[in-house]
């Protein structure tokens, strides 16, 4: 899980 992946895709 990459931080950038979750950040820009808003996977909250």
From Swiss-Prot:
Disulfide bonds: 6-11
Molecular functions per Gene Ontology: hormone activity
Lineage: Eukaryota, Metazoa, Chordata, Craniata, Vertebrata
Principal cellular location given in the protein's record: secreted
Family affiliation: Belongs to the urotensin-2 family.
Superkingdom as given in the UniProt entry: Eukaryota
GO terms for biological process, alphabetical: blood vessel diameter maintenance; regulation of blood pressure
Localization, UniProt: Secreted
GO cellular component: extracellular region
Name used for this protein in its record: Urotensin-2
């Amino acid at each position: 899980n990459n931080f950038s992946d979750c950040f820009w895709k808003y996977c909250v």
